[in-house]
């Protein structure tokens, strides 16, 4: 079954394996047969006993006048035995082909000779699949077996596929999972082939249910095939406006189907494990249950009562507290101006996805936001292209910088989605399709920030919020604390996608385009975001496409411009400063002197916390040397640097468009990205090639340079802090700041804008470390394109392929005279 419940039909792949010999068309003449087939036919005829060999074939062919061979022809065939690789039968078949003998006629002759072995080469037997694999729903950890059986001659071979990927060692009739895992869920098909042809089995869907531990006892000894409900819905008492989520999970073979009922009536289109109402009202009160069935059996879940109304909770307080309710103690209002103990920001931009559409806007957005936040005295860590493991470790490092009263800001630009009010950030190594276990849950990070007793928690999420249909897990997160200091700024509203502006090669996301114009304003953060939302609403490019959504529990007038308390020399502050400075320390500029007298200057600049640029220049050349070139090479394998992308004449050629105006001219530039992957010191080689006057030969010299661990590499993020489990998604969030509507399935972003950018950090002592914001990009500067991009799910398209594959084809439609919107 497909995800929509339709039967899946397996079609042969475009490059399906075939046997070494292909059966020829019946009406083709023998001279149209392929050489390998002719030689195989000839070998069998040459080796055949008397009465079934080539002479008997010539005799039968002679019975048809036009195919009769002369004595000279037969003698010519006989003499072929005297040649080293001669074959009388091959000679005969070619002569018959010249006379117009068809495959059908040859088959008739072989039938008369009862030469079945040769006959099978011309009419190979087919393959018949007798047992197809069944779709089934199972529990994680169960023993599972998918079975396919077929008959054919001489024998058949099996190969299993999951979607479009061949399964290693899956070459038997049974595909066995000793302890099935959630990642094993998906669609499977078996290809059966022999030397002549191949067939595909029916599709089999394997649904693996990972149920909470609280249900484990009730499902011990569950059968792989018997229909059984493992997770029952539960009765609930909800306030109007809350989210209702009912879950029923069943296992069995064939795969179970679901139908939800309310008050004895079936609910239209509610045929999944989950039944959800984003905002309940009195009309949703009633009795609910789920009918589960397959072709062999059916069961009903237990009936549950959903009550909508006020809860009867009592809150204890003293008489003084009751009298002061609504009149805050003036002693607590120590100042009219909120102060931050410190300000820390983590900025992550994911662009170069391995199995999903690549993005461009995060490069510009993270760079510009870094410059702006540093002007507001934020300690900023900016990182590009992180894997899941690296994202988790980056968050760990971010949390180390937080403390009581510290302002924490997390910005993310990249693919994302939102399910059941929980936002998920997608790492660059996420599989296709991805699920919650492959991503980072923002609400989990918020909980960890709350544990630090931060003064302000700001989340700016520049990603899509569409629902991920491949992820049906309901996260159960620990309850968030009720703190009046949380602000969420979503680039788009629930269930919608985010867009980017293209302009001359570089890109801004729509959100950042408007945010950067107001970020430095001294206003309460929620007021600032409200004005950004108003600006976006006035732009004709975004109307009906993207709208900023703000969620906040902020009760004080806190702003990103709030000053930092005068506690510069407290122990906590010193630790934070040291930790942050450690992640932003560049190697010192150096001058290399070679024996020939040539001097080469090495400089270093930071584009992001994990991206560094090395620039080299020849500062002195003795007069007797008429030519010399210098370049850097032999970088650690951890950084995966392509030599073709190193030692370029301009920063732009290396992919560094943002800092070119701040780098010295007339150098060779090499861009090192993903410094977080560096496990040892950064050691590389500086090579010098030079030529003396009057000599034709070129002389080579080299020096090895060790610059230690630059920037973020010093934190050894590849080792981690052993806290990965802190971010693992559990099952249903009841936090007060979570969306109640179901939304996005892999989401995404972006593409480009050619403006001057400033703010590169150099290792030269004389260079300033402050930065200036990029020029604003106003709507009056009409961009080249306005593009929506979101992560695509592997869709069930089966034309010309044996499995559904992801497509990135664009379907453009008119948007304005100079703009185009592409929906991927």
Swiss-Prot record:
Catalytic site positions: 415, 464
A GO biological-process term: innate immune response
Top-level taxon of the source organism: Eukaryota
A molecular function GO annotation: peptidase activity
EC number of the protein: 3.4.22.-
Post-translational modification Phosphoserine, affected residues: 135
SUPFAM superfamilies: Caspase-like, DEATH domain, Immunoglobulin
Swiss-Prot/TrEMBL keywords: Acetylation, Chromosomal rearrangement, Cytoplasm, Disease variant, Disulfide bond, Hydrolase, Immunity, Immunoglobulin domain, Nucleus, Phosphoprotein, Protease, Repeat, Ubl conjugation pathway
Clinical disorder: Immunodeficiency 12: A primary immunodeficiency characterized by onset in infancy of recurrent bacterial and candidal infections resulting in bronchiectasis and growth delay. Manifestations include mastoiditis, aphthous ulcers, cheilitis, gingivitis, esophagitis, gastritis, duodenitis, and meningitis. Levels of absolute lymphocytes and serum immunoglobulins are normal, but specific antibody titers are low despite immunization, and T-cells show impaired proliferative responses to mitogens.
Subunit annotation: Homooligomer; forms oligomers which bind to TRAF6. Forms a complex with CARD14 and MALT1; resulting in the formation of a CBM (CARD14-BCL10-MALT1) complex. Forms a complex with CARD11 and MALT1; resulting in the formation of a CBM (CARD11-BCL10-MALT1) complex. Forms a complex with CARD9 and MALT1; resulting in the formation of a CBM (CARD9-BCL10-MALT1) complex.
Protein name: Mucosa-associated lymphoid tissue lymphoma translocation protein 1
Gene source species: Homo sapiens (Human)
Gene name of the encoded protein: MALT1
């Amino acid at each position: 079954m497909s995800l929509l419940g339709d039967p899946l039909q397996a079609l042969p792949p475009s490059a399906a394996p075939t046997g070494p010999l292909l059966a020829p068309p019946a009406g083709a003449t023998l001279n149209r047969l392929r050489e390998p087939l002719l030689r195989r036919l000839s070998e069998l005829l040459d080796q055949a006993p008397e009465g079934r060999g080539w002479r008997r074939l010539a005799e039968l062919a002679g019975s048809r006048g036009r195919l009769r061979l002369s004595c000279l022809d037969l003698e010519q065939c006989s003499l072929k035995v005297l040649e080293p690789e001669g074959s009388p039968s091959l000679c005969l078949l070619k002569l018959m082909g010249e006379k117009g003998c068809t495959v059908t006629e040859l088959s008739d002759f072989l039938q008369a000779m009862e030469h079945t072995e040769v006959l099978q080469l011309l009419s190979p037997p087919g393959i018949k699949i007798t047992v197809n694999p069944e779709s089934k729903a199972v529990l994680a950890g169960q023993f599972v077996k998918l079975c396919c059986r077929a008959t054919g001659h001489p024998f058949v071979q099996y190969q299993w596929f999951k979607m479009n990927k061949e399964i290693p060692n899956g070459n038997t009739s049974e595909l066995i999972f000793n302890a099935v895992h959630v990642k094993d869920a998906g669609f499977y098909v078996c290809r059966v082939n022999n030397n002549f042809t191949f067939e595909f089995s029916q599709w089999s869907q394997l649904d693996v249910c990972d149920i909470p531990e609280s249900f484990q006892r009730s499902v011990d000894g569950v059968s792989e095939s018997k229909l059984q409900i493992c997770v029952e819905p539960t009765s609930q008492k909800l306030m109007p406006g809350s989210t209702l989520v009912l879950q029923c999970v069943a296992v069995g073979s064939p795969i179970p189907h679901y139908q939800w009922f309310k008050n004895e009536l079936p609910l239209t289109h509610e045929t999944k494990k989950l039944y959800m109402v984003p905002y309940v009202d009195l009309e949703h009160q009633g009795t609910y249950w789920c009918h589960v069935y397959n072709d062999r059996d059916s069961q009903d879940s237990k009936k549950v009562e959903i009550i909508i109304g006020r809860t009867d909770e009592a809150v204890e307080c003293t008489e003084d507290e009751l009298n002061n309710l609504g009149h805050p103690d003036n002693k607590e209002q120590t100042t009219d101006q909120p102060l931050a103990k410190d300000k820390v920001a983590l900025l992550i931009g994911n662009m170069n996805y391995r199995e999903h559409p690549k993005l461009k806007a995060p490069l510009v957005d993270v760079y510009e936001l870094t410059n702006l936040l540093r002007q507001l005295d934020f300690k900023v860590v900016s990182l590009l292209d992180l894997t899941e493991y690296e994202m988790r470790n980056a968050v760990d490092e971010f949390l180390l910088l937080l403390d009581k009263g510290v302002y924490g800001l997390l910005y993310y630009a990249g693919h994302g989605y939102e399910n059941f009010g929980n936002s998920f950030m997608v790492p660059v190594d996420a599989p296709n399709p991805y699920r919650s276990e492959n991503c980072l849950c923002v609400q989990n990070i918020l909980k960890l920030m709350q544990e630090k007793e931060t003064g302000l928690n700001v989340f700016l999420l520049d990603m899509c919020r569409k629902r991920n249909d491949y992820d049906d897990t309901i996260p159960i997160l620990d309850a968030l604390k009720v703190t009046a200091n949380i602000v969420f700024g979503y680039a788009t509203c629930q269930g919608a996608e985010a867009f980017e502006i293209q302009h001359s090669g570089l890109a801004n996301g729509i959100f950042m385009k408007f945010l950067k114009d107001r970020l430095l304003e001294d206003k309460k953060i929620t007021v600032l975001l409200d004005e950004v939302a108003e600006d976006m609403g006035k732009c004709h490019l975004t109307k009906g496409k993207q709208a900023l959504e703000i969620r906040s529990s902020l009760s004080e007038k806190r702003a990103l411009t709030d000053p930092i308390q005068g506690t510069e020399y407290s122990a906590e502050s010193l630790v934070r400063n040291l930790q942050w400075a450690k992640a932003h320390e560049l190697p010192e500029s150096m001058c290399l002197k070679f024996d020939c007298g040539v001097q080469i200057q090495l400089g270093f600049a930071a584009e992001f916390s994990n991206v560094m640029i090395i620039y080299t220049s020849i500062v002195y050349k003795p007069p007797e040397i008429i030519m010399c070139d210098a370049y850097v090479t032999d970088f650690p394998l951890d950084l995966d640097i392509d030599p073709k992308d190193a030692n370029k004449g301009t920063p732009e050629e290396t992919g560094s468009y943002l800092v070119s105006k701040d780098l010295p001219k007339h150098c060779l530039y090499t861009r090192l990205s993903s410094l977080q992957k560096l496990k040892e010191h950064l050691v590389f080689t500086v090579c010098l090639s030079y030529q003396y006057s009057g000599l034709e030969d070129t002389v080579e010299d080299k020096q090895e340079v060790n610059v230690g661990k630059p920037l973020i590499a010093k934190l050894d993020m590849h080792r981690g802090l052993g806290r990965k489990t802190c971010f693992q998604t559990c099952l249903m969030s009841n936090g007060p700041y979570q969306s109640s509507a179901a939304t996005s399935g892999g989401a995404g972003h972006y593409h480009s804008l050619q403006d001057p950018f400033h703010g590169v950090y150099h290792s030269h002592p004389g260079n300033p470390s402050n930065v200036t914001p990029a020029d604003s990009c106003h709507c009056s500067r009409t961009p080249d394109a306005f593009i929506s991009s979101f992560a695509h799910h592997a869709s069930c398209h089966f034309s010309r392929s044996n499995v559904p594959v992801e497509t990135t084809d664009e379907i453009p439609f008119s948007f304005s005279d100079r703009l185009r919107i592409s929906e991927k």
